[in-house]
A protein has these predicted regions:
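Short glycine/serine- and small hydrophobic-enriched flexible loop segments
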Residues: 227-231, 268-275, 336-346
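Extracellular/oxidizing-compartment recognition motifs
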Residues: 1-205, 220-221, 234-243, 281, ...
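The feature captures the catalytic groove of carbohydrate-active enzymes
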Residues: 113-119, 123-125, 249-265, 280, ...
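Charged, long alpha-helical assembly modules
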Residues: 257, 261-281, 289-292
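C-terminal catalytic domain of Rieske-type non-heme iron oxygenases
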Residues: 219-222, 246-249, 315
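Amphipathic, well-ordered alpha-helical segments in soluble domains
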Residues: 221, 235-238, 242, 262-269, ...
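Alpha-helix capping and helix-loop boundary segments enriched in small/acidic/polar residues
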Residues: 138-141, 182-186, 213-216, 230, ...
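Extended, well-ordered alpha-helical scaffold segments
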Residues: 191-194, 235-246, 280-297, 341, ...
Length: 346
């Protein structure tokens, strides 16, 4: 057998289904303990760098004890990231796994809040409020969302939990920053960096609308993201992969994401991406679909050049209750899409 990889013990039927994950992950220590409640000892050890491997004997451990009520702490990891946490626990007093509650938040308020109700945090899609059990000599990853702060509650009554470390797990695509921005204003430089970083977090295998939201490929929202990607990261494969995905998921005469305006955005993005990359073979692979949406959109223009789309007339959420604004916006997007298609077929 010539295969020298881990897959050498698997049969071909299994290896044919392998989908590699091109993303990387790194561990980050908490920067500070924002708040604690109840009986918790030696919590400062959680801020120290230690071997990321659990051992048999506990030493210099952080102990959460719920004998006199729930024990809780709130950690700050310093920056918003995409991923979860990894808890290394030496032992729990239940011998079956102590019940804990873990809440992720972009802010202290979100991590401390209950889900639901007016003004409170949600717990939709990428779950940020999780109940689980932590057992002895364990080192498990928990959660996959966007966060900076994490609150951990020991909900098991009359129990104790011995912890070695709690690290954040940053999951990201290792894409080099090819573009840059610099000016005399440090704040403006920081704003540019944070904007690029925010888009980078959403460049996973596909381009997501938000790391802590529904994680769908919203092709209309992809337009500003694609502009940022080509400026900062160049011709990243996540753009073409996302466009391929949404095309395959939307057989004609369907509208992408259920909205005619998002199909228009698809045509605009394909044109702009081809003009930037020059990937002719990729463009040819889209040709049949582009011809189809060109015919479909052309049927939604009256003799005066007015857009007549009746389904999926969406511009953005702030204008969604303003029909006059939506009409003007969709008319403009339709014009841009028609012009993009015209240029592609010239």
């Amino acid at each position: 057998m010539n295969d020298r990889t881990i897959f050498r013990v698997m049969d071909k039927e299994t290896t044919d289904t392998i989908h590699p994950d091109e993303r990387k992950s790194v561990y980050l220590l908490p920067r500070r303990i924002v708040w604690k409640q109840g009986r918790i000892s030696n919590e400062e050890v959680l801020l120290k760098e230690r071997e990321s491997q659990i051992s048999l004997a506990a030493w210099d451990d952080c102990v959460m004890d719920s004998t006199d009520g729930q024990a809780s702490l709130l950690l700050d990891f310093g920056n918003e990231i995409h991923g979860g946490i990894r808890i290394l626990a030496w032992k729990d007093s239940t011998d079956r796994g102590a019940r804990v509650r873990i809440r992720f938040g972009e802010s202290v308020m979100e991590a401390m809040s209950e889900p639901g109700g007016e003004g409170n945090a949600t717990n939709d899609h990428a779950r940020r409020d999780i109940r689980t059990e932590i057992g002895m000599m364990s080192m498990n990853r928990i959660g996959e969302t966007g966060f900076r702060f994490v609150r951990i509650d020991l909900e098991e009554e009359n129990a104790s939990l011995s912890l070695k470390s709690i690290a954040a797990v940053l999951v990201y695509k290792d894409a080099p920053y090819l573009g840059s921005f610099s000016c005399s204003d440090p704040l403006l430089n920081r704003i540019w960096d944070v904007g690029a970083y925010t888009v980078h977090l959403n460049m996973q295998e596909y381009i997501w609308d938000g790391i802590k939201r529904d994680r769908l490929v919203w092709v209309g929202d992809m337009h500003p993201e694609t502009l940022t990607i080509r400026t900062v990261f160049g011709a990243d494969a996540s753009v073409a992969r996302s466009l391929e995905f949404i095309r395959k998921e939307t057989p004609l005469p369907g509208w992408m994401n259920g909205m005619a305006s998002y199909t228009m955005w698809y045509a605009i993005i394909v044109h702009d991406w081809f003009m930037y990359t020059g990937y002719l073979e990729w463009l040819r692979s889209q040709e049949e679909y582009l011809e189809g949406i060109s015919r479909q959109l052309s049927e939604c223009i009256d003799e005066k050049g007015k857009d007549t789309v009746t389904e999926g007339r969406f511009l953005d959420w702030p204008s969604s209750d303003r029909p006059d604004v939506v009409d003007a916006g969709v008319q403009a997007i339709h014009l841009l899409a028609a012009d993009s298609l015209r240029k592609l077929f010239m």
